[in-house]
Design a protein with these regions (language model features):
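Conserved N-proximal alpha/beta basic substrate-recognition cap immediately N-terminal to
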Residues: 20-132
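Structural motif
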Residues: 75-77, 150, 186
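Rossmann-like NAD(P)H-binding beta-loop-alpha module
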Residues: 127-146
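Ala/Thr-enriched low-complexity intrinsically disordered regions
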Residues: 6-7
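Phosphate-binding site of ATP-dependent enzymes
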Residues: 146-147, 158-247
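Extreme N-terminal starter segment of soluble prokaryotic enzymes
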Residues: 11-15
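Short acidic/polar capping segments at secondary-structure boundaries
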Residues: 107-110, 134-138, 154-158, 168-170, ...
Length: 248
């Protein structure tokens, strides 16, 4: 992954590839753009849906309809995934660019966003029991054997479609059929926590940690969780360093 700015940088042009239109679910894009501007960068926003190959070059439109050649930027940051039906086509286009220019490169977006990949890798031992399937009966059978489970999409965001499931839920089949209607879903054994910790990593360095206090089974800020100030234990830092080595 590319580096982030820490001072006035020699990299002066960055484009944020994002979805135009609609109401944003958070202010991440605004915060990021403001910080790069403060560091002396020139900022452009490019619409996911506007990517086109013209005259042998990958291009995209800014909000004013001006078309930019993407390989002329010094840094590229993909913010959000855009429309699902065109995701793979857009990723194939972006993969032709120099990946060292990306803050979050294409391989990371494709292979590391989905949760099953982490479960099957070296970090799987640190996850709760997990079942992944596109077959509703496989997931339903696990729930009906007992225990408390969290059912969710394999690559969802913002706490959408996240459910607590036990064999006493009268609508357990309907929930699982809903989760699998478009493909794969996953069950994870529920782990009781009141404060979840999130660790921020950039450039292979741990740069911060914050907590999320939640009142139900969803710890996403978009679902009502509250960010809190927390400290990291030595054991947690050791685990984060293990994650960093795995990511590299």
């Amino acid at each position: 992954m590319g580096s982030l700015p820490t001072a006035v940088s020699e990299f002066m042009r960055i484009c944020f590839i994002t979805a135009f239109g609609g109401k944003p679910l958070n202010d991440n894009l605004e915060r990021l753009a403001n910080e790069f501007t403060n560091q002396g960068w020139t900022i452009e926003h490019i619409d996911h849906a506007s990517l086109e190959v013209l005259d042998g070059q990958l291009t995209g439109n800014d909000p004013n309809g001006i078309r930019h050649v993407l390989d002329q930027f010094d840094r590229i940051w993909v913010v959000g995934f855009g429309d699902q039906p065109t995701f793979l086509d857009r990723m194939q286009l972006l993969r032709t660019l120099d990946q060292s220019k990306f803050v979050n490169n294409v391989d990371a977006l494709i292979y590391l966003h989905g949760k099953p990949h982490l479960v099957l890798g070296d970090l799987g031992q640190h996850h709760p029991q997990t079942i992944v399937s596109a077959n509703p009966q496989t997931l339903l059978s696990a729930v009906e054997r007992g225990g408390a489970w969290i059912g969710k999409p394999t690559a969802g965001s913002f706490g959408r479609d996240v459910f607590t499931l036990t064999k006493t839920n009268s609508n357990r089949r309907a929930i699982i059929e809903h989760l699998t209607q478009s493909g794969f879903a996953m069950l994870q054994e529920r782990v009781e926590t009141t404060v979840e910790k999130r660790f921020l990593i950039a450039g292979s360095q741990l740069i911060g940690v914050y907590g999320k206090s939640h009142t139900d089974h969803r710890s996403n800020l978009a679902a009502g969780s509250v960010p809190t100030i927390v400290d990291a234990t030595s054991a947690e830092i050791e685990l984060v360093e293990t994650c960093i080595r795995w990511l590299n």
